[in-house]
Amino acid sequence: MAHVLGIDLGTTNSCMAIVEGGQPVVLENSEGARTTPSIVAFTKSGERLVGQAAKRQAITNSKNTIYSIKRFIGRKFSEVQEEIKRVPYKVIEGKNGDCAVEVEVAGERRVYTPQEISAFILMKLKADAESKLGEKITQAVITVPAYFNDSQRQATKAAGEIAGLEVLRIINEPTAASLAYGLDKKKDERIAVYDLGGGTFDISVLEIGEGVFEVKATNGDTHLGGDDWDAAIMEWIISDFKKETGIDLHGQPDAVQRIKEEAEKAKIALSSALEYEINLPFITADQTGPKHIQKKLTRAKLEQLTEHLAERTVQPVLNCLKDAKLTAADIDELVLVGGMTRMPKIIEIARKLIGREPHKGVNPDEVVAVGAAIQGAVLKGQVKDVLLLDVTPLTLSIETAGGIATPMIPRNTTIPTRKSQIFSTFSDNQPSVEIKVLQGERPMARDNKLLGVFHLDGIPPAPRGVPQIEVTFDIDANGILHVSAKDLGTGREQKITITGSSGLSKEEIERMTKEAEAYREQDLKNKERAEAKNNADNAAYQAEKLLREYGDKVDSAKKMEVEKCIEKVREVIKGDDTEAIKRAMDELNEKVQAISVEMYRAASSKASAASSPPPPPGAGGQKSDVIDAEFEKVDKDKPQA
């Protein structure tokens, strides 16, 4: 049976896993690493880089290197003004007021949606998994923060489809982590999953036991993660530098990118060390000459700079326990997820809130992908007797008279679920109703997120309050919402799947899928060209080495032919014609083969002459003291005298 790929599509890094023989296995990428940076870059030549290759060139190509795209997926341009200030690449307002990113590819302006950028990351994971397993991967389970709203979930699913994957399930990250933690646990437990990653924070409380994983409550903050800690360190470095030199580095993207990378290194190092030396030579220059940054950051200083961020995890935890109708004393185990939970301060806060030491048996960077792989195996019947009962993180409502948000499905309701309610008209002879679907906890519609709007037309004339309109909310196992409205008098019905006012149509997803596939083909061509250049360059080097060492043993005309072929190879690898490179290399290899045979024969003849035995004694007319003896053949069957 084909594997289902479990994917943790993270803000900073992504990870993938499968279930093999009933056990989850984390897959390494093509570079041999167990996590892949969630970074996409476009080079001046038009090449697309993903992962570590994109990260390596970020400093010199900051405007065309896209990271932390998860902070923009499924969100309106108007919602992300603070996030935009933190990234060197250009975020613009796209279709329907959504976010989009603008880059320059081979001298041309290109606009990509966050779904497409995410799809490029997923395509890399898919390709690496296929290479590792030697089979085609077509299905995946992809994780999202528990506190992602409907638009963000839909957008993540669309990213999977653009990447050529059938997304079997969108699963919440803390829930996935609980699956990885509790798969082999037999006793009943209540666990708290504290998940602080690169861009989001989630807290979930679950009851697990005998294969049942039931989420009791979830809470979080989709604008809080490691990126914010990096930003705090960056601001400290930049503001101190401005005080010392009067130079504001905010307007220098390359300098900002270098500072960001150094801030991230400092943050990671200070999880184990007490101080870190920040060293950024030649960060900029003015009329007095080059400027450098060299300063010490201690763990204590880092904790002071980011205290307000760490404190932001406290209230969601308290709210989650309250919604679950539990206290910290009721929790049996604390599971920490996400790279940020390696920070001593974060561990201390989580420990104080839950009142127990964190469980040490899971890898915070890999546990979510492992859980996604387990869920994939459950859906395919490879892992049995596991039941996952997740919840919807936010209340779903419709707008009613006076701009009130009337709840249909309260937050922390177990999904899948379905809820119907009867509404009526507000005016006499009202011919249609407008259904505004909302998500959030505020009592007034305007203060919640608008997920979508649709109309039910053709209502027969009647006094206000007489028509009966049945509105039904249906949330599937992915946490994605479907809404219908039915006039019970006429039977007329209108249905929509909420793709959000911020979302991609089926046609757009299909178009982007085709474009992504074309990109994949271009990537393969680029890879083939790069390999051809490397092979040709190596062949030229080996031929030169051969001529240096053994050229004196080769006919000068043939030697000249090889030298011409080497020159031709050196010339064609400057261009991009893969076939021409291969032809030149084949011609060179043919000539080298011919002179190699000649050199081998020459060497063999010389060796043969050198190793010939001396003439036997008595040969060549010299007198010998050896006496010749006569021998007679004896027939062994003949009797002897």
Swiss-Prot record:
Residues 602-611 have a biased composition (Low complexity). SUPFAM superfamilies: Actin-like ATPase domain (SSF53067), Heat shock protein 70kD (HSP70), C-terminal subdomain (SSF100934), Heat shock protein 70kD (HSP70), peptide-binding domain (SSF100920). Keywords: ATP-binding, Chaperone, Nucleotide-binding, Phosphoprotein, Stress response. Coiled coil: none annotated. One of its GO terms (molecular function) is ATP binding. Residues 630-641 have a biased composition (Basic and acidic residues). Residues 602-641 are annotated as: Disordered. The modification Phosphothreonine is found at residue 200. It holds the Pfam family HSP70. Induction: By stress conditions e.g. heat shock. Gene3D superfamilies: 1.20.1270.10, 3.30.420.40, Actin, Chain A, domain 4, Substrate Binding Domain Of DNAk, Chain A, domain 1. Belongs to the heat shock protein 70 family. Acts as a chaperone. This is Chaperone protein DnaK. It comes from Methylacidiphilum infernorum (isolate V4).
